[in-house]
Amino acid sequence: MTQQDGGQAGQAEPTKLWGGRFASGPAEAMAALSLSTHFDWRLAPYDIAGSRAHTRVLHKAGLLTADELERMLAGLDVLAADVESGAFQPVIDDEDVHTALERGLLERVGPELGGKLRAGRSRNDQVATLFRMWLRDAVRRVTSGVLDVVDALTAQAAAHPDAVLPGRTHLQHAQPVLLAHHLLAHCQSLLRDVSRLRDWDARTAFSPYGSGALAGSSLGLDPQAVAAELGFDGGAVDNSIDGTASRDFAAEAAFCLAMLGVNLSRVAEEVIIWNTAEFGYVTLDDAWATGSSIMPQKKNPDVAELARGKSGRLVGNLTGLLATLKAQPLAYNRDLQEDKEPVFDSVEQLDLLLPAMAGMLGTLTFHTERLAELAPAGFTLATDIAEWLVRQGVPFRVAHEASGECVRKAEARGAGLDELTDSELAATHPALTPEVREVLTVGGSIASRDAHGGTAPARVAEQRERVVATVAGHRQWLAG
């Protein structure tokens, strides 16, 4: 396409979207402070998509002729291709992504036609819309990564249906559980993260485009048409002031991402502990571990440690954004230039972390013999004695005391609960007949916990099936 009034892309004079009321340009330090292309340039494809939709509503409102519509859209297509290829880039004097792209459009269609695109829109409604568009796409990408992590955990659960380990509270041995049950517990929290992100998307699927600076447009434009073209399922926002000024969608996304980071950090912390020589639960695959520059024997769980560290970064991004948003009056304020970087960073960190977490978790080697050895340690079957007594009609208060006395006796002679003699059991409580031994094994304990959600093998198999089905449903949403 022939360049008009500006030569090659990137060589025209920088464009300001304001200035008629000013006798001089901004001071150098002022311009430097205002610059945002170093982080908002990623919004360029969304800005151009918005400009295409805006061009069409300008034509429908009679503000562009059919010929102008065709030439404007052609110019935007060329600009989009040049942005994608890198042929067009912002220059130092471009204040933001909007300014840079207007300069690029003027270079391609000329100032007379290109200048008409600004009618009926403001950077305020533009950036609020573009940010939503970018973030909705980013959330879908993050969601896919979370589901990959869930798939890795589910695959490990399927590969170890009978493996047992000591379940813990306060990091102390509590009750034996299936390894699959434990891994699927992490799946549940991660799937809630996905549900939160989907709920967030439903609230964010409204377009501020057409809100103008704050009061809406007087030019007969159709915000609903723009919303439909840009993929906003909810249509246009109901209040133009709210549309340009509100960033709760960004804060909510930052929370969802921070909560996801916290949940990932819990998985990561367990891998770090399990990988120690003292625990010896797992061995990391070489591809997902690192060594030491001085200690040849080291095999470090860096993926898990970075997950733990980055979770704090995500929480920091959330709190920083909330502090920025606090007490801003309606409508738009320049403080909102600071709304994007924390969210951009959170997404970037998860884009890096999620594939690594899925890879690390999916390739863990579990030492099931070690897990089975430790499962009954620490008197983890004590609760089974108490509940067995309850099933014999003994009040739980009494049963709890009797079970505690069994622990005391076993501990005193360095034995396990299953090693107490029949006479020792009967002396503790007359209802402790030899039949209690059916729950004094790890397998018996686990099999007895067959209520919904419990650790019995049949219940855990059901849980895994539901997780797999839930993941499939979320992937169907992503595909749609």
Swiss-Prot record:
GO cellular component: cytosol
The EC number(s) this enzyme carries: 4.3.2.1
Domain of life of the source: Bacteria
GO molecular function: argininosuccinate lyase activity
Keywords: Amino-acid biosynthesis, Arginine biosynthesis, Cytoplasm, Lyase
CDD domains in the record: Argininosuccinate_lyase
NCBIfam families to which the protein is assigned, alphabetical: argH
Entry protein name: Argininosuccinate lyase
